[in-house]
């Protein structure tokens, strides 16, 4: 910060004069854009996955007895500001802890902002599905893979229907959407897969000849989107809106486990964290973790769960008063929290 301020002082007059000009984002009377090709990335809001938002549980579970929970399991976010003038970008760099990053890292040239936002929403929905599967697997509860939608004129069109439950593929029981996707990915275009599915309580079997992926004709394509759901009538719904990306997976999964496990995973403490999660419970790295750690610290968290592969970046800034744990799976996160709460051995992130 001192280096930034001294730089500003040496050229104070030119920057002040320039600043008055570049607060305008277009040249008056023209379509000439004066915004800079950078975005400011900083700490975003945090949400308690054990709490409520707009009168609804952030993680709502039906069809099962739900245990009372204590404390916090907060998911964390980063804020992104784009469309800035030079003066606004300089202000973020000088007077905040934001990081300036090339706009192309947020919005690649070959994609529109709407496309990027849609991809982020899809990633967020996928993280919810994986969070549910990982939690059910940890708890030893069965899950089902349901057909959510079907692409018209695709291989599955006219064979599978929305609401069908895929039971096995090529003779192997299906434990989640990822298993179906991986089986199809190992095939070639025009290969066939045999799918056993349940519709209206009746078991059916069909052989489906795989088509071509619309985005890459060399990749086999079944043409269905799938959703994971717990078996036995249990439902899990997530009620956070206007948030994208897959990084809430770990915290969502922990919330589901906490509500169905009969114990306080967090020991009643304020725990925050981040990380993607796969169906098998593997926790993966995410972007902007230094800002997420800052957001958690500002919110009052005592403990932060960081993906092991993000550890050095997670503790690259001041986090005094908050312990940052290194976790690589859902099971590991639960064990580490228990060790922290009971005085056992746990693994912290190192620079």
Residue ranges and their predicted role:
Residues 19-40:
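C-terminal region of N-terminal signal peptides and the immediate post-cleavage residues
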Residues 34-65, 76-81, 96-151, 209, ...:
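PDZ/PDZ-like peptide-tail recognition elements
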Residues 6-25:
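Hydrophobic membrane-insertion alpha-helices, especially the h-region
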Residues 182-225, 316-351:
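PDZ-domain C-terminal substructure recognizer with occasional recognition of PDZ-binding tails
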Residues 136, 156, 163-166, 195, ...:
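Terminal peptide-recognition signature
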Residues 306-317:
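Short, glycine/polar-rich helix-capping loops at beta-to-alpha or helix-loop-helix junctions
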Residues 156-179, 293-296, 300-306:
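Conserved PDZ fold ligand-binding element
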Residues 259, 271, 279-304:
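Glycine- and Gly-Pro-enriched alpha-helical subdomains that act as flexible
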């Amino acid at each position: 910060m001192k280096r930034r301020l001294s730089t500003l002082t040496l050229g104070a007059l030119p920057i002040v004069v320039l600043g008055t000009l570049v607060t305008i984002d277009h040249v008056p009377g023209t379509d000439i854009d004066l915004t800079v090709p950078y975005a400011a990335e900083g700490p975003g809001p945090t949400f308690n996955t054990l709490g409520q938002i707009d009168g609804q549980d952030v993680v709502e579970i039906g069809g099962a007895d739900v245990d009372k929970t204590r404390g916090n399991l907060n998911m964390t976010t980063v804020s992104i500001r784009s469309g800035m003038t030079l003066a606004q970008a300089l202000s973020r760099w000088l007077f905040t802890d934001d990081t300036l990053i090339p706009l192309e890292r947020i919005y690649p040239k070959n994609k529109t902002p709407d496309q990027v936002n849609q991809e982020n929403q899809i990633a967020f929905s996928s993280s919810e599905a994986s969070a549910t599967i990982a939690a059910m697997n940890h708890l030893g509860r069965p899950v089902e893979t349901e057909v959510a939608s079907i692409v018209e004129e695709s291989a599955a069109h006219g064979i599978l229907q929305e609401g069908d439950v895929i039971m096995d593929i090529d003779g192997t029981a299906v434990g989640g959407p990822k298993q179906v996707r991986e089986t199809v990915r190992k095939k070639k275009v025009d290969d066939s897969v045999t799918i056993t599915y349940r519709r209206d309580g009746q078991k059916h079997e069909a052989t489906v000849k795989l088509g071509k992926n619309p985005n890459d004709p060399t990749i086999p394509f079944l043409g269905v989107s799938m959703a994971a759901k717990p078996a036995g009538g249990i439902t899990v719904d997530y009620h956070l809106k206007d948030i994208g990306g897959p990084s809430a997976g770990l915290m969502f999964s922990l919330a589901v486990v906490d509500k169905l496990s009969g114990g306080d995973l967090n020991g009643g403490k304020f725990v925050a964290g981040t990380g993607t999660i796969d169906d098998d419970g593997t926790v993966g790295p995410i972007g902007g973790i230094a800002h997420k750690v800052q957001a958690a610290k500002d919110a009052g968290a005592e403990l932060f769960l960081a993906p092991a592969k993000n550890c050095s970046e997670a503790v690259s800034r001041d986090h005094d008063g908050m312990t940052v744990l290194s976790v690589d799976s859902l099971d590991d996160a639960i064990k580490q929290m228990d060790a922290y709460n009971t005085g056992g051995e746990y693994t912290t992130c190192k620079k």
